[in-house]
Regions:
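Bacterial Sec-dependent N-terminal signal peptides
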Residues: 1-23
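N-terminal helix-cap/turn-to-beta initiation motif at the start of protein domains
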Residues: 19-31, 45, 58, 126-131
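Short structured motifs
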Residues: 19-20, 51, 160
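One face of beta-strands
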Residues: 28-36, 48-50, 174
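A short hydrophobic beta-strand element
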Residues: 30-32, 63-65, 133-139
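Generic short beta-strand segments
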Residues: 33-39, 139-144
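Central antiparallel beta-sheet cores of small beta-barrel/beta-sandwich binding domains
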Residues: 42-124
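Beta-sheet ligand-binding and adhesion/scaffold domains
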Residues: 91-179
């Protein structure tokens, strides 16, 4: 039954990504501006202006797009990344940092997801276009070292799998408006 349930979700996610893959990233083009709020266990610790720039670079049907991230101003912190098609019909893209780092990203429904590990931290970045004028950017990060490990036992006839949980140390969120 669990396998049927998992297969059902896999099928649904593939259908959702196929439904939106045709309009991505064209319908996301523009400059998205707002305030990025940074939180930890004590609450909000920082706010900074943020811009996401998405613009077509070349004229091919499934070409590259700018995917620039600006924190504060271009003079303060500008990351001129590019969005590169891998298998757009399957929702697969790469964010190319233009420095030998290129990270797979996945478009599922209205969200572009990028999940990676760098310098001991697990990071999940999501970009969600909620309507034609609004994009929500979120980052969840924490150590790649498990906070706890439970399960890995047997209860009656059922094998209980091992489950590792990971700490969240920072949450970032920005509601961006198309300029």
């Amino acid at each position: 039954m669990r396998y049927v349930f998992s297969s059902f979700f896999f099928l649904i996610f593939n259908v959702l990504s196929a439904q939106t893959a045709a309009s991505f990233p064209e319908s996301w083009q523009g400059d998205w501006v707002g305030t990025l709020d940074v939180f930890n266990g004590k609450g909000k610790v920082q706010s900074v202006e943020m811009t996401v720039e998405i613009h077509k670079i070349d004229t091919s049907k499934e070409g590259r797009y700018t995917f620039g991230l600006i924190y504060g101003s271009k003079e303060q912190d500008w990351r001129p990344y590019e969005l590169v098609p891998v298998a757009p019909e399957k929702g697969m893209w790469k964010v190319d940092e233009k420095n030998s780092i290129a990270m797979e990203s996945y478009l599922y429904g209205p969200k572009l997801l990028c999940w990676f590990v760098v310098q001991g931290s697990r990071i999940l970045c999501t970009y969600e276009k909620t309507d034609d004028a609004t994009m929500v950017f979120e980052v969840i990060s924490g150590s790649e070292t498990a906070a706890s490990t439970t399960g890995n036992t047997k209860q009656g006839e059922e094998d209980i799998p091992e489950v590792k949980t990971y700490p969240c140390s920072v949450f970032q969120r920005a509601v961006l408006k198309r300029r």
